[in-house]
């Protein structure tokens, strides 16, 4: 059991520290402090010893060296049950420090400011703080370490109840080491980012637990949601049940797809695959077009809207069962209508484009795969017409829309579209010709015709059978990467059927 008789307090985040220090004073705890923390305590009538008076050595180098002293670290690291430690501490007049309360210079807050300069970032790298935290954490059986103001109240209760158990101290030790590890990761990551080093030789990642989820992909799987250090979620939940693991995946997919398409785009997501995408002058029309692609699959889906959700659109959405909606904005009228369906989850995120993640992380059995996200786009100038039949300007618009949709569909992916809306989606088939047939059949099953449609394929056609199947379905024009050893055969098939075909030179596999 740790009995608190002497504490060292040096904090950047001064939340609740005055009240905590007053409690320590009232319970006979001697306080040692530094710099701004010392001034704050004394200004509030709290008895505290200045660190330089305690060590007999002044703060130097404009405060860069304050606590890096044997009297400090000996007091933190001394094992009082070890006779040799006790003898040496008595010989050198090093009192035991039972409690260290430290949180670190606000490096992350500093470098998050626009236009921060290198010198300012460097001056916010804490040296003494992490050293004290690590010393106390290493000696957790004899020294309590606190790094989070939210823990002060619990410790007050424990001190008043007789002391700190080893089990409790171990919990704070783990938290302390996580705190310093996170701090070092923030520093390392920032300097790598400044150097443009996207894939450093050593990758350190720190994520903060945002919430525990009810369960994972299935009820028997435990799950939690974590946020990375440098990216704070700007998803604003407005109503609805707590987000599940699967909800978060689908909301993320809806967000990414909508953000990379034109204004007033609506996409409907089911199990990470879009089952309808469209854009129009009004998001209500876009929603109606997107939903008609596959109204059966849209049941229980998540809707992404790059635009404002108004009352009419809210009414249309609530006529069917949906898990949730993510949009740039909801009008008061829309929110009032949605409030009658309180289980529908609503998330608002105003700036779709700026919130996009740069990297895609995939854990595998023996490591972590990291790649740049597939945000690269093409323009009309990148298209290469490879057939005898040439596209019109309307055809180009339709093909470009189809191409913008296909990269979000699981491979092998085929999508049939009009100029601004999907008609049939063939997703996730092991054979490309199967995806061709699946997309056409799904359109026909809901009464949509793919005659005269634009078709995008996420990768090249390895054989002419896919082209023959598209011609049979009635497609007008095809956009695909090209690059197959049988490109000549595929082009010949398109010419035989009088189809338009363009190559992009870019593949969009999605696993």
Swiss-Prot record:
<dbReference type="Pfam" id="PF01808">
    <property type="entry name" value="AICARFT_IMPCHas"/>
</dbReference>
<keyword id="KW-0658">Purine biosynthesis</keyword>
<dbReference type="GO" id="GO:0003937">
    <property type="term" value="F:IMP cyclohydrolase activity"/>
</dbReference>
<keyword id="KW-0511">Multifunctional enzyme</keyword>
<dbReference type="GO" id="GO:0005829">
    <property type="term" value="C:cytosol"/>
</dbReference>
<dbReference type="Pfam" id="PF02142">
    <property type="entry name" value="MGS"/>
</dbReference>
<dbReference type="InterPro" id="IPR002695">
    <property type="entry name" value="PurH-like"/>
</dbReference>
<dbReference type="InterPro" id="IPR011607">
    <property type="entry name" value="MGS-like_dom"/>
</dbReference>
<comment type="pathway">
    <text>Purine metabolism; IMP biosynthesis via de novo pathway; 5-formamido-1-(5-phospho-D-ribosyl)imidazole-4-carboxamide from 5-amino-1-(5-phospho-D-ribosyl)imidazole-4-carboxamide (10-formyl THF route): step 1/1.</text>
</comment>
<comment type="similarity">
    <text>Belongs to the PurH family.</text>
</comment>
<keyword id="KW-0378">Hydrolase</keyword>
<dbReference type="GO" id="GO:0004643">
    <property type="term" value="F:phosphoribosylaminoimidazolecarboxamide formyltransferase activity"/>
</dbReference>
<feature type="domain" description="MGS-like">
    <location>
        <begin position="1"/>
        <end position="147"/>
    </location>
</feature>
<dbReference type="InterPro" id="IPR036914">
    <property type="entry name" value="MGS-like_dom_sf"/>
</dbReference>
<protein>
    <recommendedName>
        <fullName>Bifunctional purine biosynthesis protein PurH</fullName>
        <ecNumber>2.1.2.3</ecNumber>
        <ecNumber>3.5.4.10</ecNumber>
    </recommendedName>
</protein>
<comment type="pathway">
    <text>Purine metabolism; IMP biosynthesis via de novo pathway; IMP from 5-formamido-1-(5-phospho-D-ribosyl)imidazole-4-carboxamide: step 1/1.</text>
</comment>
<dbReference type="GO" id="GO:0006189">
    <property type="term" value="P:'de novo' IMP biosynthetic process"/>
</dbReference>
<dbReference type="InterPro" id="IPR024051">
    <property type="entry name" value="AICAR_Tfase_dup_dom_sf"/>
</dbReference>
<keyword id="KW-0808">Transferase</keyword>
<dbReference type="InterPro" id="IPR016193">
    <property type="entry name" value="Cytidine_deaminase-like"/>
</dbReference>
């Amino acid at each position: 059991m740790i009995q608190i008789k002497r504490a060292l307090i040096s904090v950047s985040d001064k939340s609740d520290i005055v009240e905590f220090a007053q409690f320590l004073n009232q319970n006979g705890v001697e306080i040692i402090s530094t710099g701004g923390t010392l001034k704050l305590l004394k200004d509030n009538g709290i008895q505290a010893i200045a660190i330089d008076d305690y060590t007999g050595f002044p703060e130097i180098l404009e405060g860069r060296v304050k606590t890096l002293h044997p009297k400090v670290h000996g007091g933190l690291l001394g094992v009082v049950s070890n006779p040799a430690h006790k003898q040496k501490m008595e010989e050198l007049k090093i009192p035991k420090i039972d409690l260290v309360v430290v949180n670190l210079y606000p490096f992350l807050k500093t470098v998050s400011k626009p236009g921060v300069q290198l010198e300012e970032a460097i001056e916010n790298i804490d040296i003494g703080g992490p050293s004290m935290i690590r010393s106390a954490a290493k000696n957790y059986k004899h020294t309590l370490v606190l790094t989070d103001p939210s823990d002060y109240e619990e410790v007050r209760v424990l001190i008043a109840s007789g002391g700190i158990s080893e089990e409790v101290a171990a919990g704070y030790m783990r938290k302390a080491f996580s705190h310093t590890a996170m701090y070092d990761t923030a520093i390392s990551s920032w300097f790598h980012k400044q150097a443009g080093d996207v894939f450093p030789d050593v990758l350190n990642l720190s994520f903060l637990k945002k919430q525990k989820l009810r369960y994972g992909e299935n009820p028997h799987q435990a799950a939690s949601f974590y946020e990375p250090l440098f990216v704070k979620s700007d998803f604003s939940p407005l109503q609805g049940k707590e987000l599940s693991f699967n909800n978060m995946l689908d909301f993320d997919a809806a967000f990414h797809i909508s953000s990379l398409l034109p204004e007033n785009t609506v996409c409907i997501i089911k199990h990470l695959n879009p089952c309808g995408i469209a854009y129009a002058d009004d998001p209500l029309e876009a929603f109606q077009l997107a939903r008609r692609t596959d109204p059966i699959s849209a049941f229980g889906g998540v809707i992404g809207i790059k635009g404002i959700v108004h009352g009419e659109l809210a009414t249309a959405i609530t006529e069917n069962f949906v898990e949730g909606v993510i949009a740039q904005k909801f009008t008061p009228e829309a929110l009032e209508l949605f409030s009658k369906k309180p289980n529908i989850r609503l998330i608002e995120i105003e700036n779709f484009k700026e919130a996009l993640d740069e990297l895609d992380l995939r854990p595998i059995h023996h490591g972590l795969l990291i790649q740049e996200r597939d945000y690269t786009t093409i323009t009309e100038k990148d298209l290469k017409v490879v057939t005898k039949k040439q596209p019109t300007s309307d055809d180009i618009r339709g093909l470009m829309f189809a191409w913008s949709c296909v990269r979000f569909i699981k491979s092998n992916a085929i999508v049939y579209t009009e100029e601004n809306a999907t008609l049939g989606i063939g997703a996730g088939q092991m054979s490309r010709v199967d995806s061709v047939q699946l997309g056409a059949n799904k359109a026909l099953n809901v009464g949509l015709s793919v005659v005269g449609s634009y078709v995008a394929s996420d990768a090249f056609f390895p054989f002419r059978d896919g082209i023959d199947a598209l011609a049979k379905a009635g497609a007008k024009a095809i956009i695909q990467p090209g690059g197959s050893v049988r490109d000549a055969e595929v082009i010949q098939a398109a010419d035989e059927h009088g189809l338009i075909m363009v190559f992009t030179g870019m593949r969009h596999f999605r696993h």
